[in-house]
């Protein structure tokens, strides 16, 4: 009887493993976050925004100049995977900036209105001392960025300052970053909830970046992030 009971239970056990695996997939994470946003009503940060049409050519990959793209970047089944090593070269020979593998969203630079970046991100444990998302100013601006989201030891931070979200490792999270150009403010949402906002120094124009960009302290030997369903939204005043 015990043996038969054990035999009967194996299908249930296998099904449980399949369900657990599916819940950790990007598609399941997107569905869960979307359902939460619908249930939250006013908690959906994209409400009232219009979706911007993006094409494959809008996603410009920047990676260490001396290695093939395939050795630092992969796009598979709708997921962008970025990784870089602390010993890597900059993304071109004209700069002395830190190593990076990032996407620069091109063709959608902006200078007015309210703009929003949305993406579902994943940072594996061990990755530290890295920026995973930026709002970059125009080339040659006095300040390079108005927002950088850094990861240090599992905590997502505004630059290397205020903590935005703890325990960021090894889970899919929905990130929304809203930039109001006229008001010179940015707000950060995690899984549909506002976690941070601040005033920023205005510039002439802006664009979004995401991936991995090594910072100046507490970096790991290898830095990685994954992204899916990256979307840009905008609205006028």
Question: Language-model segments: which ranges?
Answer:
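Secretory/extracellular carbohydrate-interaction modules
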Residues: 64-67, 72-154
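Ligand-recognition surfaces built from glycine- and aromatic
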Residues: 30, 37-54, 91, 109-121, ...
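N-terminal secretory signal peptides that target proteins for export/translocation
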Residues: 1-8
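Cleavable N-terminal signal peptides of Sec/SRP-targeted secreted and luminal proteins
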Residues: 8-33
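Short strand-turn-strand beta-turns centered on an Asx-Gly dipeptide
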Residues: 189-193
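Short tryptophan-centered beta-strand motifs in secreted/extracellular beta-sheet-rich domains
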Residues: 171-180, 186-188
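Short, aromatic/His-centered strand-loop micro-motif at the edge of beta-sheets
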Residues: 152-176
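Short beta-strand segments enriched in hydrophobic/aromatic residues
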Residues: 86, 123, 179-181, 214
């Amino acid at each position: 009887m015990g043996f038969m009971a054990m035999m009967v239970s194996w299908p249930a056990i296998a099904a449980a493993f399949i369900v657990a695996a599916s819940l950790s997939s990007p598609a399941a994470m997107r569905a869960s976050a979307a359902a939460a946003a619908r249930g939250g009503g006013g908690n959906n940060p994209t409400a009232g925004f219009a979706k911007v049409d993006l094409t494959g050519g809008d996603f410009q990959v920047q990676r260490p100049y001396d290695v093939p793209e395939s050795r630092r970047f992969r796009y598979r089944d709708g997921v962008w995977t970025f990784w870089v090593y602390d010993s890597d070269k900059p993304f071109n020979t004209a700069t002395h900036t830190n190593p990076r593998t990032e996407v620069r969203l091109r063709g959608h630079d902006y200078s007015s209105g309210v703009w929003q970046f949305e993406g579902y991100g994943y940072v594996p444990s061990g990755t530290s001392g890295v920026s995973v998302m930026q709002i970059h100013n125009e080339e040659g601006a006095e300040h390079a960025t108005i927002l950088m989201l850094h990861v240090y030891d599992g905590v997502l931070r505004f630059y290397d300052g205020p903590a935005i979200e703890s325990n960021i490792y090894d889970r899919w999270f929905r990130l929304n970053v809203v930039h109001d150009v006229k008001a010179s403010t940015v707000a950060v949402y995690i899984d549909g909830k506002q976690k941070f906002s601040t005033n920023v120094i205005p510039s002439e124009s802006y664009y979004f970046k995401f991936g991995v960009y090594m910072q100046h302290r507490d970096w790991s030997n290898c830095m990685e992030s994954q992204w899916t369903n990256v979307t840009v939204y905008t609205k006028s005043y």
